[in-house]
């Protein structure tokens, strides 16, 4: 195993460990107030479904998969005929958030190795997931494989100025050789994608974009509202956390 490959696997595991710690703390915080979070989840799921259906209708009996459903994914209130979510931490989330996790079948597996037959789903959702995973491209390949011809993909990921990719690579290098200094935004992600790199994930796949959106120009224009620390100051120079969204059809 090469240094970079081993480092990537360690980053992916570290990102999962940090996410689980965060969600455990969140579960304790929202206990007894789940209704507020459920209302937010319902609104987000409806907004995304409306965005998809403005481009391509979803059948009432559609079989829907969410890759990286996480603790509060779209699938739980998406209104699917059959809804399935996959996430490496799914077994933990069923225990932490029983109020809604039971609304869909969830399977503890990463998006790089989906345990489904080819052409199994009418709709696949992947909402802000791939930059936390071991292989963003492999996830897109698997999504294309399990989508039925004519099926719909909803994909969203954060994109950033190229500065953050370079900084994340440097951070990964010193972590790989054992230096203990850890920067939180880089520890929570395996990769910081530029807009070009996010688009390149789709190259050569049997997917045709029906709708493509990004808010890079808006994020560049507005920047952070307040400068609270050095990271916010950097965002004024190098934009961070712009949205890139694709709604695509399987050819």
Language model features with spans:
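Class I SAM-dependent methyltransferase SAM/SAH-binding core
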Residues: 65, 69-113
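A short acidic, Gly/Pro-enriched loop at the edge of an enzyme's catalytic core
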Residues: 109-124
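Short alpha-helix
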Residues: 184-206, 210-212
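A short SAM/SAH-binding and catalytic strip from SAM-dependent methyltransferases
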Residues: 123-134
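Class I SAM-dependent methyltransferase Rossmann-like catalytic core
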Residues: 2-57
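Conserved class I S-adenosyl-L-methionine
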Residues: 154-181
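Core SAM-dependent methyltransferase catalytic element
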Residues: 203-207, 211-213, 218-251
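A short glycine-rich, Lys/Arg-flanked "PGG" loop and its adjoining helix->strand segment in the class I
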Residues: 137-152
